[in-house]
Amino acid sequence: VDTCADDGSPGSLRAQVTAAASGDLIDLSQLTCSTITLANSAIMVTQPSLTLQGRGPEALTIDGAGHYSAFYHLGAGTLGIADVTIANGYYAGSFEPKGGCIFSKGNVFLFHSVVTHCTVGSLSASEPAIGGGVYAEGNLTMKNSTITESHVLASVNGPNAFGGGGYVIGSVAMLYSTISNNTATQFFGANVGDGGGLFVKGAVDITYSTISGNSADYVGGLEIFSNQPATIFNGTISGNVGKLGYGGLWTKSALTISNSTIAFNAARSDASGTSTAGLHSLAPLVLQSSIIADNIGPNGPSDLGGMAGISITGDNNLITSYTLPPPMNTRSECPHLQPLADNGGSTRTHELSHTSVAIDHGSNPLTLQKDQRFATRDVGAATDIGSVEWQPGETDERLFVAGFDGLCDQ
């Protein structure tokens, strides 16, 4: 590709994609311009597999101009996006209102890329708005990537909307990645939105990653609507809001969480009184050395809950409130978490204050060498509980930033 113009000329991105064979790499790394603005429609990718290689998400943006989705992938293979920002995709209609920036009949692989400011709205009485940032009928893999500021809007007279950041029918694998500030919500006060950050119907593997600041009517952060296994380790789920119920994480899949933090999520209103602000599960849980705290429901602290009678095993956790029996050796003191911040590494995390009872009271079942921000694990007498290992010399100054006051610190 040798031009940022979307004019169909031989060196344009659209022309190069049309001419490519399956498995080809489209090289955008030599472009000196910063933005390719789509002029007429989404770029159709009919090949089973294709990869786009840019020169960095801060250096090159493919812009839907607020009128079109950026890519419409019809192949059953993988659409790879590397070192690119995909932005300002928009689709509002009645035919397949899916994938505000990326629509794929196959798999999507994001490497060192950003998907941002994408929107899907349904104008159909039967078709839901799905996947504000990304819609994938196969798998979504994210490495050092971010999906942010994307939205789905429920139709006035139609079904709910699902997956503000993304909707994935296959599996999701996140490594060193972030899903943040996405929404799934009502359109003119009609139906509701589910899964503000991510809605997944397959297996889930989240490592060294953060899901934060997302919101929906139900399940602000991550909704796992699957019977396949799910795992989270060295992960953070924080600051997600379910306006009508379920804040951080809702799962019907058997879930294992290790060395992770689920905190400061909220469920603002719940007429039934059965939803949970932090982690709500309908299936067996294994919880290892994780913090679930400072989550708040309409009636107060709300950290761990779900369907009565499910198996919950593990040890060395810190869970401050629960409606289901927690695993053995669970502490319930305040963890004294600092605000979500850039503490090093690829994703934002919650550091521990130096007085936290989480320090030296955890375990390391996966023998991790690093914490979420890639600092050394197992500093001191034992592993710390949660996604971040306290390091000697770290201060607690962020505890006193304006407007920050953890629920259990009050």
Task: Tell me the role of every PLM-derived stretch.
Residues 1-106, 269-274, 281-396:
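N-terminal, post-signal-peptide segments of secreted/periplasmic proteins
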Residues 31-32, 87-88, 117-119, 151, ...:
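Generic short beta-strand segments
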Residues 91-99, 119-135, 152-163, 183, ...:
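Glycine-centric low-complexity/flexibility signal
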Residues 104-115, 126, 136-149, 168-194, ...:
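Predominantly extracellular beta-rich ligand-binding scaffolds that present long acidic/polar faces
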Residues 195, 221, 396-406:
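Ser/Thr-rich, Pro/Gly/Ala-heavy low-complexity intrinsically disordered linkers and tails
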Residues 408-410:
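Short, solvent-exposed mixed-charge patches
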